[in-house]
Amino acid sequence: MEEDEFIGEKTFQRYCAEFIKHSQQIGDSWEWRPSKDCSDGYMCKIHFQIKNGSVMSHLGASTHGQTCLPMEEAFELPLDDCEVIETAAASEVIKYEYHVLYSCSYQVPVLYFRASFLDGRPLTLKDIWEGVHECYKMRLLQGPWDTITQQEHPILGQPFFVLHPCKTNEFMTPVLKNSQKINKNVNYITSWLSIVGPVVGLNLPLSYAKATSQDERNVP
């Protein structure tokens, strides 16, 4: 299993392609953006939230009073399309942009993100920390991550927040070993994002996990 603890760039791109395929099927808006020379690229998603005392998703599911899920189970339950927020005008809309890149140094995916109000005002690191749910904030301080920091986007050359990848292999190894033990197929990106995403307000619809199981059953 040692060779599976890290992933190569081609394997990363294959996992991303599988992930984006399901995203397109459910309208989750993830897409692949190639670099200028098309030698590499990254996954991207833009997400809007309402800031009005509590943070709400663009479909109107309030996170006020939310409970902390185990990191390996932090998937988003499906929402009804009719749950559209009608009070947006009286609130502040925040635009979140999430990028998933491959780290050649660590041989794992890395989550970059930035956030701003619709008038262009960026959120500061302090704002980002205030938006992290308390249970995830404690886990950030204790590990397996160092912390949220600000770095230059390796492809765009612009400032982004990032969850440092130095401990990714450490918390992903048990996931991979357990999946091998029970002979279960997993998409690395799906499992990894379900762990790190909720820390910065990014929850995956549960259907991603189901899609992986379905793909496994369809393998001849």
Swiss-Prot record:
InterPro entries: Atg3/Atg10 (IPR007135)
EC number: 2.3.2.-
GO CC term (a single one): cytosol
UniProt subcellular location: Cytoplasm
GO biological process: autophagosome assembly; autophagy; ER overload response; mitophagy; protein modification by small protein conjugation; protein transport
Stored Pfam families: Autophagy_act_C (PF03987)
Key words, A-Z: Autophagy, Cytoplasm, Protein transport, Transferase, Transport, Ubl conjugation pathway
Active site: 166 (glycyl thioester intermediate)
GO molecular function terms noted in the UniProt entry: Atg12 conjugating enzyme activity; Atg12 transferase activity
Subunit structure: Interacts with MAP1LC3A. By interacting with MAP1LC3A, it plays a role in the conjugation of ATG12 to ATG5. Also able to directly interact either with ATG5 or ATG7. Interacts with IRGM.
Biological role stated in the UniProt entry: E2-like enzyme involved in autophagy. Acts as an E2-like enzyme that catalyzes the conjugation of ATG12 to ATG5. ATG12 conjugation to ATG5 is required for autophagy. Likely serves as an ATG5-recognition molecule. Not involved in ATG12 conjugation to ATG3. Plays a role in adenovirus-mediated cell lysis.
Assigned protein family: Belongs to the ATG10 family.
Name of protein: Ubiquitin-like-conjugating enzyme ATG10
Gene responsible for this protein: ATG10
